[in-house]
Design a protein with these regions (language model features):
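AAA+/SF3 P-loop NTPase mechanochemical coupling elements
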Residues: 106-115, 144-161, 172-182
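Walker A/P-loop
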Residues: 47-84
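Conserved alpha-helical scaffold flanking the Walker A/P-loop in AAA+ ATPase domains
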Residues: 42-45, 98-118
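P-loop (Walker A) phosphate-binding loop of NTP-binding proteins
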Residues: 58, 92, 160
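C-terminal engagement/docking regions of AAA+ P-loop ATPases
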Residues: 1-12, 16, 248-333
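Conserved C-terminal "switch" segment of AAA+ ATPases
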Residues: 11-19, 32, 183-256, 283-287, ...
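Conserved AAA+/SF3 P-loop NTPase catalytic/coupling segment centered on the Walker-B
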Residues: 111-138, 152, 167-176, 188-196
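Pre-Walker A (pre-P-loop) alpha-helix and adjacent loop at the N terminus of AAA/AAA+ ATPase modules
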Residues: 14-61, 244
Length: 333
């Protein structure tokens, strides 16, 4: 662990220099995507911290286009899996097929073998398919037949779900949702952004080509540097206070939250707050984490890790309301 001010200063200079590629990446993706800078930054946090992202938003908000454009900008392999009720695990991970000419079984790899995997409408697939995908996310390897295959690095799963249509869907269990680094709610574009989008589509303009501007090696180096970013023990304690407040709010003088929360965040909440805060610091081209980094990613990291009671639902209290009250109460270092 870094201890001296000189160590931190040197790391800060290295991160500031190495983080210059982020501007090129944002500009290149911005040639195609109008707005959605918030979603893009969340995808970059996932990329830097090796964490998978759950995206929630209505159709037509450029989720697929943003992810594909980001993959093209770093010369990564992209695949899209449309989840449906009749999908089988083999359709995701692959299977063994019989080759009559060679009189043997050969492996046919599934779409999971890519750097960026878009799992579209993950809540439309049955539990066994969701489990196959989530196991691959956790293990970062796939077993087909008797052979185990390592998945390429970087490997990032971006799963989407539509908040409007619930008919014919299979709710993602809390234990499965907990595996995602973040749950990001994708919002609508602004009025000005939507006007630009409308004009481009009405005029039938050809979409600009996204060129590779960042190498895979730069991404992997940035990941390692993100892990090295300094986090003071006071910030670590701040993260722990936030997470423990979701479990025992009465210890932080938040007694009114006790009947609202059915269960608090698992230890994955603490881990993911720490790694995402480091990635946020890297996005800010800083070699150390400050409390504002934690606050800025807190809602997206914790919103799917907190269970609410029926009383909370009856009063229209959301996980965001709970997190905001905790952030107001917990002392900032």
């Amino acid at each position: 662990m870094l201890k001296t001010a000189e160590d931190i200063r040197q790391l800060n200079d290295r991160v500031s220099y190495a983080g210059r590629f982020l501007d090129n990446l944002r500009n290149e993706v911005g040639k195609v995507i109008i707005g959605q800078s918030y979603m893009l930054d969340r995808l970059l946090i996932g990329l830097l911290s090796s964490g998978h992202i759950l995206l929630e938003g209505v159709p037509g908000l450029a989720k697929t286009l943003t992810i594909r454009s980001l993959a093209q900008a770093i010369h990564a392999r992209f695949s899209r899996i449309q989840f449906t009720p009749d999908l089988l695990p083999a359709d995701v991970i692959g299977t063994m097929i019989y080759n009559q000419q060679r009189n043997e079984f050969v492996v046919r790899k599934g779409p999971i073998f890519a750097n960026f995997v878009l799992a579209d409408e993950i809540n439309r697939a049955p539990a066994k398919v969701q489990s196959a995908l989530l196991e691959a996310m956790a293990e970062r390897q796939i077993t087909i037949g008797d052979t185990t295959y390592k998945l390429e690095d970087p490997f990032l799963v971006l799963a989407t779900q539509n908040p409007l249509e619930q008919e014919g869907t299979y709710a993602l269990p809390e234990a499965q949702a907990d595996r995602f680094l973040m749950k990001v709610v994708v919002g609508y574009p602004t009025r000005g952004e939507e006007q630009v989008i409308m004009r481009q589509n009405v005029q039938g303009l050809a979409a600009p080509v996204v060129n590779p501007v960042v190498s895979m090696q730069e991404i992997l180096s940035a990941r390692q540097m993100t892990r090295d970013i300094y986090m003071d023990e006071k910030v670590e304690q701040y993260i722990l206070d936030i997470v423990f407040a979701t479990r025992s709010p009465e210890q932080f003088k938040l007694d009114k939250l006790k009947p609202i929360i059915s269960y608090g965040s698992s230890p994955r909440g603490s881990i993911n707050l720490a790694v995402a805060a480091k990635a946020q610091a890297f996005l800010n081209k800083r070699g150390y984490v400050v409390p504002e980094d934690v606050k800025s990613i807190c809602v997206d990291v914790l919103r799917h890790r907190i269970g609410l009671t029926y009383e909370a639902e009856a009063e229209n209290i959301t996980a965001i309301n709970v997190i905001e009250q905790i952030l107001e109460r917990v002392n900032t270092p």
